[in-house]
Curated annotation (Swiss-Prot):
Pfam family, one: MSG_insertion
Stated name of the protein: Malate synthase G
Names of the cofactor(s): Mg(2+)
Residues given in the record as Mg(2+) binding sites: E437, D465
Family label: Belongs to the malate synthase family. GlcB subfamily.
Gene that this sequence comes from: glcB
Positions bound to glyoxylate: R342, E437, G462, F463, L464, D465
Source species: Mycobacterium sp. (strain KMS)
Swiss-Prot/TrEMBL catalytic activity: glyoxylate + acetyl-CoA + H2O = (S)-malate + CoA + H(+)
GO cellular component: cytosol
Subunit details: Monomer.
Organism placement in taxonomy: Bacteria, Bacillati, Actinomycetota, Actinomycetes, Mycobacteriales
Keywords: Cytoplasm, Glyoxylate bypass, Magnesium, Metal-binding, Oxidation, Transferase, Tricarboxylic acid cycle
Amino acid sequence: MTDRVTVGNLRVARALYDFITDEALAGTDLDPDSFWSGVDKVVADLTPRNQELLARRDDLQAQIDKWHRQRAIGPHDADEYKQFLTEIGYLEPDPGDFTITTAGVDDEITTTAGPQLVVPVLNARFALNAANARWGSLYDALYGTDVISEEDGAEKGTSYNRVRGDKVIAYAREFLDGAAPLASGSYADATGFRIEDGQVQVELGDDQWVGLADPDQFVGYTGELGSPQWSILLRNNGLHIEILIDPDSPVGSTDKAGVKDVVLESAVTTIMDFEDSVAAVDAEDKVLGYRNWLGLNRGDLSEEVSKGDKTFTRVLNPDRTYTTPDGSGELTLPGRSLLFVRNVGHLMTNDAITDAEGNEVFEGIQDALFTGLIAMHGLKESDANGPLRNSRTGSVYIVKPKMHGPAEVAYTVDLFSRVEDVLGLPQNTLKVGIMDEERRTTLNLKACIKAAADRVVFINTGFLDRTGDEIHTSMEAGPMIRKGAMKSQPWIKAYEDQNVDVGLATGFSGRAQIGKGMWAMTDLMADMVEQKIGQPKAGATTAWVPSPTAATLHAMHYHQVDVYAVHKELEGKQRASLDDLLTIPLAKELAWAPEEIREEVDNNCQSILGYVVRWIDAGVGCSKVPDIHDIALMEDRATLRISSQLLANWLRHGVITEEDVKTSLRRMAAVVDEQNAKDPDFKPMATDPDSSIAFQAAQELILAGGTQPSGYTEPILHRRRREYKASVAGA
């Protein structure tokens, strides 16, 4: 039984109440009683509206399901379908031309294009690594990944391989030639660096010194001129590059110019995630996340890390200070990524707070209140608030996921306004990032932006969740194509193009981020470097990466592409059509061979089991899960949603049977067990699937997938995780 504190009509879990009262409110000048009274009032006033919005989702889905069932025989009539969606209010009127007016936004969001990390906030080590990933070693990123091949004696090995190191150095020199070219010659021939009359000069041998093609790219340096250990700071497309020189270092001693590393400004922004990458089902979990968020905003989060026989404490990096080129002043740059926080969406409740009747309070309301409160510590430096600051413009950046249409965005705006009143913050302090990951938001994106025109700081496409909603919305229309074929469908290209086009049409360039989705293949960095440049080329000012290393590698793309120049080329264009966006990804004919169907079912079942077993048994919401071919993929609830919805769709239309699903799950459970055999804490599923809560959760996600709200996985996952925690506690 959870110990609770009565606050008006609310019953707050003691762990949450004590944390907020004793830790989060400390140093804010807010009176605890007044704050909790405000929480009570916000919950009472906004809960009915939240419920109405969810009922509207269900009503629209029921009408769409009925429409498709009535037309099960015969071809799909696209014009009739579009008219129907308009009549029921699913498609809403275009709001006309406007420009967003969001003010007080940090440069990292408005004018600096670069990578964005998303990290589970429940894991302090991951959170610290991500916050510190503002700067990353290009040498390390190249040496440790497959961007540099292991051919011709360049194996990684267990100790430094000079052959591989030389390849890294050559790659970095070629990168510098593109990002900060010399007036003549190449960095590949550099034998020395110096500063003369406030300008950087590079020696190309035989005492031949050349400057930069654009001298203004040199913006600072560290160290004493003439000292062997120093660095040069360059800037290109708004991002910084630092060349570290130390001829006595292990790497510098092998380099003819004494360069020991090239450091890139990498994860310009990071999203600390309370949503799809975490497993937070109760007050205990939520407090862990809130406490880490507090440490990040106060600047005092730390974590003991062990590597081999060494243990050290990881803390947040300080800002970086450089001497200006003429030697007369200082330039200070942020040492940490600018932090967003992703709240949960409108659907879920959490028993961290209940009302007097025992009903759980909407988790999105809780997150807005508590993450907003905690973020106040990141707005100013003081003894009470901590030594570091997040925003330098006084803003709090909250990503709001899984909103369906303009009315839900308007509700979020009103929620944030009420939170500001409770916290005593100026209106529009809480900024919103709109995830364009639900079909009704995509189709009405301009109206969604209009609803938050004075708060919006980003729009972002999320292919996986968006595909999950695409399948669920049209669940009754017929069997869908295979998962791997989704990316080649007309609606996908239209979806990605429209997000950029609408963002530009509403004034995002220079004011807010236009984002694109995650690279999930965590070990395939060579492929990422080759392919992910397509996102900035398409107009994205940021795109998601799975690790600090990936952030450093992806940062190269923003040196190679001037995204704001791309915006000028794209402005005024409308590349996406509504007809393409409404094209349902139905299989034109069921021409799959039995082995193809089995492969698709096995692949999805393995993916579901591999992710769900860690979610339920270990409380891990974001996992590097090997797929059926042992390729490591970054999995979160979005990947789970699409996999479970596809199988639910095939089950609904008789492509597969319930027995096919159960048989595949049992077979794939053995595969997942084997993939996790080296984990001493892993509980095998295949030996007794009936008693494995994780196995049963995976099975339920598929068999009951057709009836889950919007195809979301959270209701089943949360219930089953609580069931597992209760079983462990009672053991």
